[in-house]
Amino acid sequence: MLVNHRRAGRFALVALLGGVVMLALVAWPATLPAVQWVDDGWNRAMVSIRFTPFVWLAEAFALLGGIWINWPLRVAAMVILAVRRNWVQLGAFVLAIVTSEALIGPLKALYARPRPPQAILETSSYSFPSGHAIAGAVTAVGLVIVLLPPGSRRWSWEVKAAIFASLMALSRTYLSVHWLSDVVTGALLGVGLALGWPALFQEVRDVRLPRWRARKAAAAEAET
């Protein structure tokens, strides 16, 4: 279990660093044109391969990242953790939700990036980063952590959940409601927060706290 939570922590750190790099690339005037060039090409490609059944599928995927799906699942997960009295996982899950939701609005307002043209769905907020991608990743990965015990099986499903969240985020680009860089950034931040908080809490509970208690006990014994 120790190896798995540290591996998840390293994965979370890489994802968060990737998200920060994307934030910098979009913010920096010297690199934004290159990012936009990739985004424009991706958007044109998505528009060129639109096919009604695929649009329906993309809309279904996009729905999974919305509040009407995300929040009931989150509340159910928190109830399960509370019933099990798993306060460490509950605290980590709540912090992942709070920090991710706290990022979305300010970042969108800061970047004030317009949505792509030819969007299929109506949207009112700015484009960058994708709130659906962040929220979907936090929920998908968080549910795996809630429902499965620590171990190699959970780690495997965490990776699958991260991939699923990424596909769900990419569906937003097929509908032209987000640029590619929007959803890549959102997915990286969401996965990083969803994996990072539980890994940090488990490190403190299983490693740091026992070491601190052992040192405290040794110091007390040395004084007697």
Task: State each model region's role.
Residues 26-27, 43, 104-108, 112, ...:
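Membrane-water interface at transmembrane helix exits
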Residues 1-69, 109-119:
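N-terminal transmembrane-helix/juxtamembrane module of multi-pass inner/ER membrane proteins
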Residues 30-34, 66, 84-85, 111-112, ...:
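Short helix-capping/hinge motifs at transmembrane helix termini and TM-loop junctions
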Residues 24-25, 33, 37, 98, ...:
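Transmembrane alpha-helix boundary/anchor motif
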Residues 2-3, 119-224:
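Membrane-embedded catalytic cores of phosphoryl/pyrophosphoryl-handling enzymes
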Residues 37, 72-75, 79-153, 161:
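Membrane-interface loops
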Residues 44, 92-97, 157, 186-187:
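Alpha-helical transmembrane segments of multi-pass membrane proteins, especially transporters
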Residues 2-16, 87-92, 152-159:
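N-terminal export and membrane-targeting signals
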